[in-house]
From Swiss-Prot:
Oxidoreductase keyword on record: yes
Pathway annotation from the record: Amino-acid biosynthesis; L-lysine biosynthesis via DAP pathway; (S)-tetrahydrodipicolinate from L-aspartate: step 4/4
Annotated active site: H131, K135
The encoding gene: dapB
Keyword Thylakoid: no
E.C. designation(s): 1.17.1.8
Protein name in the entry: 4-hydroxy-tetrahydrodipicolinate reductase
Enzyme type, top EC level: oxidoreductase
Organismal lineage: Bacteria, Pseudomonadati, Campylobacterota, Epsilonproteobacteria, Campylobacterales
UniProt record similarity statement: Belongs to the DapB family.
Keywords: Amino-acid biosynthesis, Cytoplasm, Diaminopimelate biosynthesis, Lysine biosynthesis, NAD, NADP, Oxidoreductase
Catalytic activity: (S)-2,3,4,5-tetrahydrodipicolinate + NAD(+) + H2O = (2S,4S)-4-hydroxy-2,3,4,5-tetrahydrodipicolinate + NADH + H(+); (S)-2,3,4,5-tetrahydrodipicolinate + NADP(+) + H2O = (2S,4S)-4-hydroxy-2,3,4,5-tetrahydrodipicolinate + NADPH + H(+)
PANTHER family hit by this protein: 4-HYDROXY-TETRAHYDRODIPICOLINATE REDUCTASE 1, CHLOROPLASTIC-RELATED, DIHYDRODIPICOLINATE REDUCTASE
Residues involved in NAD(+) binding: G8, A9, K10, G11, R12, M13, G75, T76, T77, A99, T100, N101, M102
Length: 242
């Protein structure tokens, strides 16, 4: 049975993963780690580590992992380029899976949105994400991943075409503009819409998560799979084989 360490165990996702592991037949909890814990013990007792912490927590985890390489599943969002570079470097000596969303449905949404962006080149693209009032970052990491995918499908640099808000007399919408908008309220687990709009018709691709268990179960499946992989960076597409 695979021993999974939970890094960021006191957070919403950490608690959900702990709960889902109680009924998992292929894996069990090795240790619950949170800020101020013993990193050495976490690595010694775990076959795989799942990280849902904070950017600073992920940074600390990656630095320590170089001394005791273990497969890492990283789902922390809001990571900057420095941390992403550190992650890429660390993947030379251990398998690392990184995704802003562990839902298999979101992975398919991302795939379909990329294909639609390529096929519907004259359609305007707008992305809307909705989350609970407690979410700290905006736009969500998932929304940004979707935006990157649809921009790449059209050979566009997202940084040059992304819009995050509209107010006042701003003129007409530009052809390549990709809007990424955020709503916050209540206890919404997560909803993402990628819309393609043209005169006379529009297509909207939606994904709604109704429980954090969706993400937790996805992370556990990925952790079990990653434990058998060689050292390199992996994405949700590698896991799904698409």
């Amino acid at each position: 049975m695979i021993k999974i360490g939970i890094y960021g165990a006191k957070g919403r996702m950490g608690k959900q993963i702990e709960e889902c592991l109680k009924s998992e037949t292929q894996a069990r909890i090795s240790i619950l780690y949170d800020k101020g814990g013993n990193l050495g013990e976490l690595f010694e007792k775990s076959d795989v580590i799942i990280d849902f912490s904070s950017p600073s927590g992920t940074h600390e985890l990656l630095n320590y992992a170089r001394t005791m390489p273990k497969p890492l599943v990283i789902g922390t969002t809001g990571l900057d380029e420095k941390i992403l570079h550190l992650m890429q470097s660390a993947s030379e000596v251990m398998p690392i899976f990184y995704a802003t969303n562990m839902s298999l449905g979101v992975a398919v949404l991302n795939y379909l949105a990329s294909k639609a962006s390529q096929m519907l080149r004259n359609f305007d693209i707008e992305i809307l994400e909705m989350h609970h009032r407690h979410k700290k970052d905006a736009p969500s990491g998932t929304a940004m991943t979707l935006a990157q995918s649809v921009a790449k499908a059209r050979n566009l640099e997202l940084e040059k075409v992304r819009v995050s808000g509209r107010d006042g007399i701003i003129g007409e919408r530009s052809k390549d503009e990709i809007a990424v908008m955020s709503l916050r309220g209540g206890d919404i687990v997560g909803r993402h819409t990628v819309g393609f709009y043209e005169d006379g018709e529009f297509l909207e691709l939606n994904h709604t998560a109704t429980s954090r268990a969706t993400f937790a179960k996805g992370a556990i499946k990925i952790a079990i799979w990653l434990s058998k992989q060689e050292a390199k960076m992996y994405s949700i597409n590698d896991f799904l084989g698409i």
